């Protein structure tokens, strides 16, 4: 995991993510806390957030980090492509990607994981790191598990 966090640190985050209360207002707070916990673990220079499906596009949801792109079309950039393919996409070096949408010049690597609730795609978990980074299969599995926990908090 290079300069960010090790897999044990990440796995401990899953224990800290609360389950749904059934109340959208309470769950929004739980969702924000889960993203904050991941952001702090990865380091202050990271960006962690959600893009949520709304009216045929992905709109910026709760996040931790610098201001970000507010709307991303399906199939565009890493986030939109992740949603279109419905599979995780890990980019070691974003400068090597043709259709990369640069929302933060500090981002050097990115991983996106689809969020699915009750069989329906509802969004994308997006994580940007400030260094070129190879994402291991262990990390990808962690982020998939994190996305499942996040799906439980979405209403």
Go through the PLM ranges and name each one.
Residues 45, 52-103:
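Regulatory sensory and allosteric helical modules in signal-transduction proteins
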Residues 47, 112, 124:
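Short hydrophobic/aromatic beta-strand element in the GNAT-like acyltransferase core
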Residues 26-30, 34, 74, 138, ...:
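Short amphipathic alpha-helical segments
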Residues 116-129:
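Sensory-domain boundary capping and coupling elements
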Residues 1-63, 67, 154:
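Intrinsically disordered, low-complexity terminal regulatory regions
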Residues 109-116:
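A short, aliphatic-rich beta-strand micro-motif
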Residues 18, 129-155:
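Juxtadomain coupling helices with adjacent low-complexity linkers
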